[in-house]
Structure formats: C-alpha cells, structure tokens
Amino acid sequence: EAVIINPIQKKTAAFAIFVDSTTNARIGKAILDYRNAVEYDGLSAYIIADNWRSPDEIKAVIIRLYKAMPPLEGVVFIGDIPIPMIRDAQHLTSAFKMDQERYNFQRSSIPSDRFYDDFDLKFDFLKQDTTDHLLFYYSLRADCPQKIEREIYSARIFPSVKNDSKYILIEKYLKRVVNQKRETNRLDNVMTFTGHGYHSEALDAWNNNLTALREQFPSLSEPGGRLTNLSHGMSKNMKDIVLGELQKPELDLAIFHAHGDYDTQYLIGYPPAENINDNVDAIKLFVRSKMRDARDRKKSIDEVKSYYQSAYNLPDTWFAGAFDDSISCADSLYSANLDLYSCDVTKLAPQAEVVIFDECFNGCFIKPDYVAGTYIFGNGTTVAGIANTVNVKQDIWSDEFLGLLSY
C-alpha cells in the first residue's frame, strides 16, 4: 500500500518525491530531511512511496498532483522506480537511429522520463523486460504531438549498483544535497572542455564561447571568479589536466562537449603524428587493434590481416605482437590515457556541484557504472548531472538558459 506524506509548508508550487517502498524503509530519515530541505527552498513537497508496478501507475499520480493546488512543477525518482523504454520515437532524438527490427528491444529502445513529464505524449504499452524488471517498453503513438514540450521537470537519483550498497549511496547523496542547500555559494568558477572529432576541431566554432559564459555568469569576471576553457588539442596529457581541474575545491560547474559512451568520456583521441616514425607507430597500433577486435568478435584474423595488407600494402612485420601480452598491455595503457572512464572518476572527488555532459550515452542509467552516476554518487560534491541516455549531436544548444544557475 502506498505511503503518502503530504507537504508541511503551503507554497505556491509543489514538488513530488517518488520512491520505492524498500528504499523508503531503509533510508526514510534521509528522504524526510531531503523533503524538508526542498520545502526550505520554497516548494511544497510530497513523498510518495510504493511498490510501483508500472510507469502508468506513477504517471497517474503525477497528473493528479499537477491538477491540484498548489500545482506540481517537478518530480524526482529515488531508487527502483519503473523506467520507460520508448520505441518508435527516434525522430524526437538528435542522433539515435537504430533498426528496431534488427536489434533487441533493450538496445533499440530509449530510456526516457519524457514519459512522465510530457503529458501530451501518448504511448501504447508493449511489454516488461524479462531480465530487468524495471524496464517497461512503450511505443509512441502516431496520433499525439510529435514534439517534446514538458509540463514539469524531472530527475532521477539512481545508482548503477544492484546490491544493497545502493541504499548507502543514495543516503550519502541526499545528505550532501541537504548540507549544500544550507550553504551560500555563488557560481563563480567554471571549467569547460571540448573534445576531439567534431566541430570543436574548428576553433572558430568556439570563438565566442568564453564571451557567452561571461555574459551568463557575470561573477566569472569579478575578483575571485575563474573560467577555465580546455580544448583537446592543448596537450597530449589532457586527461591529467582535466582530472586536476575536476578536483579543485573552488570549482562550481563543469561542462563537457565531447564524444562519449555510457562509461567513457572521449577526450583527445590519438595525437597527430609529428614525424614519419610517429606515423608508422600509429599504423601498427591501429592494425594490432583490428586484429584483436577480430579475435574478440570471433572473426577470421587472417582475413582481417589480408585485407589491410592488400588495401594499404603493409608488411608482415607491422602486424607483429598483436597478441603478445606485453605489447597488448602497453597498447591498452596508451589508449586508456587518452580518455576518462567511470573507473577513473570513482577514484576522484569531483568538486563541481553541477556537471553538464554534452556527450553520447553518459546518462544511460540502465547501464552499470554509467558516467553521470559515478560523479553523482562519488566522493566529491557533485549534486546534479545533466546527461543523455542515448547518443546526441554535439552541435545543439546544450547550454541554453544556463545563466539561470547564476540566480
């Protein structure tokens, strides 16, 4: 049976905290403290706990609260809340295009809480996932608006771990939020990073980025303010530089414009060759990786080798050592130093309270060790991550209205 805790404060707008019954039973005090902090911020806050059986169940409650007084303006989902997996809606994404008939449901569907916060979108229920009981598949109906215009905002507090440690992580996070809401900390320290492989290759495309950020955050130009703008081409050791910046105590906001995967932030790519030997080494590294890839995919290694030899007239010696343990290890370490992985973030204490991941898949919360989650539930001070569950174009206006954070 659902547990509903009504607001204490009468405000002009409301906020709803949805939580599963087990999480509420385990860390109920932390959730109550979080509710009180939200109300201190100026919102009437509900707590609704239940053994939720479907997304439709939750959406019905959301719409009811939206029509009540004071009207609902936003929701947060804590713990094991059903996850809508949307199909037949790829035209609403900027870059996610996948054959729904060729690939399985989980891979070709989009985890999206637009199911909950855009009331005009209509869906037909398809099925519940057989391996992950939190996933529910829906098809977007053709007779509803084919654009996203949300009535409310929404967010998730959802660690990627499956064992009981998730309750500890959620509790620690909620305590962090409560403590930060008691502090006065204006946004006057920002780091931006632009990765390799898209329009950041053209520096003219970022010519006015610093100007825009200083207009959005005037405090960056005041004494004590700081704006650090990093580009992938500045250093071959960019990973160490980014890691160092992320751990500076004064950092308030970090913005990443780069390629990504659910557990990876792609930073610099392979650096350009400076001489002939660099070019040869780069080709050797490339063909060794292709041979290992063929082995891992159970394809013919000889066919792959033959293809690259005939296509690029490469000698046998350039393929040597592909499966040698020491060379494989060296290649792996070299590649690992180019990018930022979830396992790197877990060793850090990221200090930015807000991180924007303008990168593919970083917010895919159905995956283990998804990047945004490692920041949120890590050892630092991050309380908000804005990320994508699927791939996304990097030439969209990802920081529109960002200046609102300065108020």
PLM features: what roles do these ranges have?
Residues E1-Y407:
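Cysteine-dependent hydrolase recognition
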